[in-house]
Amino acid sequence: MFVWKDEFELGIDKIDNEHRKLFEIANKGYELLKNEFYVDKYDKIMDIIVELKEYAEFHFSEEEDYLASIGYKKLFTHKLEHDSFIKKVESFNIKEIDYDQDKYIQEMLDFVVTWIKEHILEKDREYID
């Protein structure tokens, strides 16, 4: 399970709440990974990927609007980071899911959680300092 920690707080309620939601989506993947009652997880994996992509696009748009409103000088670079995340999610090879569903979920979660944590702790922290 992926736990929200105080160190992820930026002090901007709207952004912090949206970041928490990204953790919640990742936790759906974790719960699916640990659920031994689903023999075929393909549809659930696809649901999580779609939700992750759609919510990330929403969040990134909101965050970029906020950054524009405060005149953040590194907005373009920050947007490129967001774009790379979306491209990676879009590149998840859905044909590979069926070969080893749990392995696929784990690899997907490793990428998503690492990216989100690093992005919040490094890139997002830059605009509040």
UniProtKB/Swiss-Prot annotation:
CDD domains: Hemerythrin (cd12107)
Keyword Metal-binding (UniProt): yes
Pfam short name (any one): Hemerythrin
Superkingdom field: Bacteria
Family annotation (InterPro entries): Bacteriohemerythrin-like, Haemerythrin_Fe_BS, Hemerythrin, Hemerythrin-like, Hemerythrin-like_sf, Hemerythrin_metal-bd
GO MF assignments: iron ion binding; oxygen carrier activity
Record's keyword terms, sorted: Iron, Metal-binding, Oxygen transport, Transport
List of residues binding Fe cation 2: E63, H78, H82, H119, D124
Residues that coordinate or bind Fe cation 1: H19, H59, E63, D124
Gene3D superfamilies: Hemerythrin-like
Function recorded in the entry: Oxygen-binding protein. May be involved in a storage mechanism or for delivery to oxygen-requiring enzymes. The oxygen-binding site contains two iron atoms.
Family: Belongs to the hemerythrin family.
Database matches in NCBIfam families: bact_hemeryth (NF033749), hemeryth_dom (TIGR02481)
Quaternary data: Monomer.
Protein name (Swiss-Prot/TrEMBL): Bacteriohemerythrin
